[in-house]
């Protein structure tokens, strides 16, 4: 019987992390937006400690990952764990591994005393939305906005 385990990523995993980021972006039909490099991952995750990565392993084979970071809730007066990326290899889906990864992250939130566990999901991704709702997650009436590239530079330099 297969056993799912987890391990924290280390600096030797930057290539694997970037590979999973690209796989997720491809699934989301946004691969052309990925400009991150191994050096970026090394710098922000392992040198500046701005994010953490956990791998899911089936019988010692890495089959998925989660990348997360902290945000702050002024309403709660506490930090939130923000899940940026979650990806399970397609051939391993349907085995409860996505739920197990979310359970692992929820335990981190509880054990570390954080205030909330949050993430975003593309509006077209109905299978994931239905899955999250089945876990008791609530959709909030928020819109996510991004400023990058020229628009960011323009605002910064007006």
Regions found by a protein language model. Give the residues of each.
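A short beta-loop-alpha structural element at the N-terminal edge
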Residues: 5-17
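A short helix-loop-beta-strand connector motif used in the catalytic cores of GNAT acetyltransferases and
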Residues: 43-55, 82
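Conserved acetyl-CoA pyrophosphate-binding loop and the N-cap/start of the following alpha-helix
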Residues: 92, 96-104
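Conserved active-site alpha-helix within GNAT-family acetyltransferase domains
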Residues: 99, 123-141, 147
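Conserved GNAT acetyl-CoA-binding A-motif
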Residues: 110-120
